């Protein structure tokens, strides 16, 4: 976009009481699934017609209920793998949280995409 007016309209929702995703995945905290799902449905209620979650680890939970959400979700893992394969077909490095690494999100989605 060349100007502010050319950017898409966005709603940002930061629900700061959502339990830490990595802490849960390491067995040390509460499950954040319902908070994440509630946040997505809140955005839909506010008029969002497409959703994007910028937390890699959150997609571990989103994968479990993605079909329950009535609007499309831009999946950060799938989009990263797609772009990485176009830019660097021989492979790419990943820097991520321990939670993202332990879930095997990128490995699983990369395998599924071929």
Summary of predicted features, one role per range:
Residues 1-114:
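Non-catalytic structural scaffold of enzyme domains
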